[in-house]
C-alpha cells in the first residue's frame, strides 16, 4: 500500500515521502496515529496544497523538543530513593515511568515513552546515564542517581 508520510518516521522516511508499506502497518498504526494518509490522487493534491502548514508544524515540534533537551541537559543529576538491601540490590526495580516522574518533578516534562532503557529496568543502587528520545532528531542525556531509601 502506498502512503504519504505526514511526519518523520524512523527507518521509513520523512514528511512528504511516498512510501510503500504493508497494509496492516498502514491501517493499524500509521493512519490512526495521523502519521500518514493513503497516496490517492486527491490526497496527493491536498498534501501539496498544505505542505507548508505541515512543515511549519514539524518545525515547531522540533524547536520545542530542542528547548526541552536544553532544559534536560542543564539539570544536575536526578535522584531516586528506593528501598534496597545491604548489598545495594533494590527491592523491585526502577523503570521508565519512575524515571519520567523523577525528571518531571525536577522541572522538565518527560513522558515515559521518551525514556530509553535498552538494558532493561534498574535493579541496583548507583549512578546511571539515561538517554531520552524527545523527538525523531533530538536526544538528551541525564545522570540518574539511585540511592537507598532511609
Swiss-Prot record:
<dbReference type="InterPro" id="IPR009027">
    <property type="entry name" value="Ribosomal_bL9/RNase_H1_N"/>
</dbReference>
<dbReference type="GO" id="GO:0003735">
    <property type="term" value="F:structural constituent of ribosome"/>
</dbReference>
<keyword id="KW-0699">rRNA-binding</keyword>
<dbReference type="InterPro" id="IPR020594">
    <property type="entry name" value="Ribosomal_bL9_bac/chp"/>
</dbReference>
<dbReference type="InterPro" id="IPR000244">
    <property type="entry name" value="Ribosomal_bL9"/>
</dbReference>
<comment type="function">
    <text>Binds to the 23S rRNA.</text>
</comment>
<dbReference type="InterPro" id="IPR020070">
    <property type="entry name" value="Ribosomal_bL9_N"/>
</dbReference>
<dbReference type="InterPro" id="IPR036791">
    <property type="entry name" value="Ribosomal_bL9_C_sf"/>
</dbReference>
<dbReference type="Pfam" id="PF03948">
    <property type="entry name" value="Ribosomal_L9_C"/>
</dbReference>
<dbReference type="GO" id="GO:1990904">
    <property type="term" value="C:ribonucleoprotein complex"/>
</dbReference>
<dbReference type="GO" id="GO:0019843">
    <property type="term" value="F:rRNA binding"/>
</dbReference>
<keyword id="KW-0694">RNA-binding</keyword>
<dbReference type="InterPro" id="IPR036935">
    <property type="entry name" value="Ribosomal_bL9_N_sf"/>
</dbReference>
<keyword id="KW-0687">Ribonucleoprotein</keyword>
<comment type="similarity">
    <text>Belongs to the bacterial ribosomal protein bL9 family.</text>
</comment>
<protein>
    <recommendedName>
        <fullName>Large ribosomal subunit protein bL9</fullName>
    </recommendedName>
</protein>
<dbReference type="Pfam" id="PF01281">
    <property type="entry name" value="Ribosomal_L9_N"/>
</dbReference>
<dbReference type="GO" id="GO:0006412">
    <property type="term" value="P:translation"/>
</dbReference>
<dbReference type="InterPro" id="IPR020069">
    <property type="entry name" value="Ribosomal_bL9_C"/>
</dbReference>
<dbReference type="GO" id="GO:0005840">
    <property type="term" value="C:ribosome"/>
</dbReference>
<keyword id="KW-0689">Ribosomal protein</keyword>
Amino acid at each position: 500500500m502506498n502512503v504519504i508520510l505526514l511526519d518523520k518516521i524512523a527507518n521509513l522516511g520523512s514528511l512528504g515521502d511516498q512510501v510503500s508499506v504493508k497494509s496492516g502497518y498502514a491501517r493499524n498504526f500509521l493512519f490512526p496515529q495521523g502519521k500518514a494518509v493513503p497516496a490517492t490522487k486527491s490526497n496527493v493534491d491536498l498534501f501539496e496544497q498544505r505542505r507548508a502548514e505541515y512543515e511549519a508544524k514539524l518545525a515547531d515540534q522540533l524547536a520545542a523538543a530542542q528547548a526541552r533537551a536544553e532544559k534536560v541537559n542543564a539539570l544536575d543529576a536526578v535522584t531516586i530513593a528506593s528501598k534496597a538491601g545491604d548489598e545495594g540490590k533494590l527491592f523491585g526495580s526502577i523503570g521508565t515511568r519512575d524515571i519520567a516522574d523523577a525528571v518531571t518533578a525536577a522541572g522538565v516534562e518527560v513522558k515515559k515513552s521518551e525514556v530509553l532503557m535498552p538494558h532493561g529496568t534498574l535493579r541496583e543502587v548507583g549512578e546511571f546515564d539515561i538517554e531520552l528520545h524527545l523527538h525523531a532528531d533530538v536526544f538528551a542525556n541525564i545522570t540518574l542517581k539511585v540511592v537507598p531509601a532511609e
